[in-house]
């Protein structure tokens, strides 16, 4: 099997030998934030997704190590099977196939990571590589005129901000478990800033929940004061930062913490940019009456992409859970939600097991916390549309955790 030499992330003066699947895993995980969709040119994102999925499948077959299965992965596989069944009764099979491709990628990422990764050096190389690419993207987005030199290379801001949730948690974990305290703390803070500067409420909420989950993993019930403090900081940010407050409410004048405490602020005051109306319309038309099975995989996406709805020119419903309900019903939502519930619970159990080494604990807390944050963002955005940059990262960390556990058990 082909081998390559890379710098050891634990000692930059040393070199490490990796086999072909390990090198391809590092490359795949490090470059998920690259979109290659230059404006005015051929959109390569869907093609790249298909190619990556084929390569992951090939990697599973050529790697001498076995993929690791868990209740989370099995549940997710059943969910994919249910999506395929949904093609049999959908009026939009073409869009259904595209939806399946997007949901299939996290599954393949979990399986391929659990197969390729057996050493902590490979895990750190992949994670640090992904963080370097994310740092470069921040420079491209925020340094004046630099973005013009790289049009369409990175995913746009919405997807990137959700990707930064995983990188923020990864940096925080390295702060706790490595000697480079100052560097990793600064990077953790840096990855929090874009969603605030861009005023992306979805990513702000996702980052907040990811941090709360991280501290709960680490300190359990002792973390409640810290979790409460993080939540208070989120509330303060909503009301104290003018740009966030202006985007949050239809009329931000007179909106403050005092009004929140007195009950003067209701859901009617929140500016959802039409999301609430879209969700209600979608559920009324495609979910109610077909609660168990929905109306078929890809149906809602086809309706929005073809503008067969009263909310033109909007082309997505901005809620993955509403789309699951409309396309695949309660069965689909239970299977998808159950898989990630098992994932987070498994990560929590692994993190509390003191027999495992630091690398496994680090992987577990990053996977569990970033999964919680990313799942929350799916409530107000179609995160699966950018699955290479978003949902695949918690799943990738989870897959690497399974691979490291397999090495630990073998030893």
Feature-to-residue mapping (PLM):
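Aromatic-anchored transmembrane helix interface
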Residues: 72-82, 93-116, 134, 138, ...
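Alpha-helical transmembrane segments of multi-pass inner-membrane proteins
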Residues: 53, 108, 121-149, 154-219, ...
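Hydrophobic transmembrane alpha-helices and their immediate junctions
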Residues: 132, 328-372
